[in-house]
Amino acid sequence: MAKQRLILLYGGRSAEREVSVLSAESVMRAVNYDRFSVKTYFITKDGDFIQTQEFEAKPAADEKLMTNATVDMSQKIKPSDIYEDGAVVFPVLHGPMGEDGSIQGFLEVLKMPYVGCNILSSGLAMDKITTKRVLESAGIAQVPYVALVDGEDLEQKIQEIEEKLTYPVFTKPSNMGSSVGISKSENQAELRASLDLAFKYDSRVLVEQGVTAREIEVGLLGNVDVKSTLPGEVVKDVAFYDYEAKYIDNKITMDIPAKIPEEVVSLMRQNAEAAFRALGGLGLSRCDFFYAEDGQVFLNELNTMPGFTQWSMYPLLWENMGLSYPDLIEKLVGLAEEAFAKREAHLL
């Protein structure tokens, strides 16, 4: 039987491009090469599409995907040239211009099946403020917050923050992930610096109440019939789970499954599945919770293209459920084809 083509898109224009490369390299090594052949395209910081490597068999352990430092610009293509009949695209892209609906819309115009959420759910989940408002309507508990938009009266918003919240608070760009641009503030001076940082990444910013809590994550897989994993816990050796702690310094470990009461496990899985449905999720997501010292459970965010490295929480959660990394990839390809068929059938 002829192999099916799996196309990996990686890199991208967002600040999370390095995570994307790590995730794509993990996928490239884990693919079942009896079933798939792999073709890769690097998207540069400027948005150029570069044809990079092809694999018919599992690459060597030291094989690296080409990046800005190693790509051959003579291999630059028109973005639409990635089209191949029968291929499925795995957009292993994180952050803006990757998991915000942009690339998903492009792939739908090309009439190509792709792994993950569609335009609407990607866009909704990428924006933290919009996500909170959707989840509020679904009755899912979240930490108190204040939303800011560039151009609003900053002094008035700082006053609102200090009236509604108590220090410490966390300031986040609304449209970023992987803890990029997020910082903790213990006083107004630090808050002002945090707002300056967050507004460098987005014109919409979220300030959330800091809570003393454990960070618990649940994996989601499916389209209409979504399944969830047992929760896993992020165990940190740092005060704040930032980008460097996650991907560079290796200062975190995972406890899978998390050691939490059964009733909390049930609530988290129920809320994760409800959030996925409320946002119109497809394929995969990772739902992140705060489990506070007083027993309260808050949904923090739903990540529609979670980190996919071999040490990332999402594939490890499914491995704990008995679904291996290669089988997880194969399942995601099947879900992509199912979603594509339904999407095309709706175009009457």
UniProtKB/Swiss-Prot annotation:
Binding of ATP, residues: 162-217
Return the similarity comment: Belongs to the D-alanine--D-alanine ligase family.
> InterPro entries per the record?
ATP-grasp, ATP_grasp_subdomain_1, D-Ala_lig_Van_CS, D_ala_D_ala, Dala_Dala_lig_C, Dala_Dala_lig_N, PreATP-grasp_dom_sf
Specify the protein name.
D-alanine--D-alanine ligase
| Residue intervals of the ATP-grasp domain | 132-334
Instruction: Kindly list the places in or outside the cell where this protein is found, as annotated in its UniProt entry.
Output: Cytoplasm
Q: Which cofactor does it need?
A: Mg(2+); Mn(2+)
Q: Name one GO biological process term.
A: cell wall organization
Q: Spell out the molecular function terms from Gene Ontology.
A: ATP binding; D-alanine-D-alanine ligase activity; metal ion binding
Cofactor binding description: Binds 2 magnesium or manganese ions per subunit.
**What does the record give as EC number?**
6.3.2.4
The keyword ATP-binding belongs to this UniProt entry's keyword annotation: yes
The pathway to which it is assigned is: Cell wall biogenesis; peptidoglycan biosynthesis
Report which reactions are catalysed by this protein. 2 D-alanine + ATP = D-alanyl-D-alanine + ADP + phosphate + H(+)
This entry carries the following GO cellular component terms, namely: cytosol
Which controlled-vocabulary keywords does the entry list? Answer: ATP-binding, Cell shape, Cell wall biogenesis/degradation, Cytoplasm, Ligase, Magnesium, Manganese, Metal-binding, Nucleotide-binding, Peptidoglycan synthesis
Name the lineage: Bacteria, Bacillati, Bacillota, Bacilli, Lactobacillales
Any idea which positions bind Mg(2+) 2?
301, 303
Task: Report the PANTHER family cross-referenced here.
Answer: D-ALANINE--D-ALANINE LIGASE, D-ALANINE--D-ALANINE LIGASE A
| Task of the protein | Cell wall formation.
**Source organism superkingdom:** Bacteria
The residues listed in the UniProt record as binding Mg(2+) 1, with positions renumbered to this chain, are 288, 301
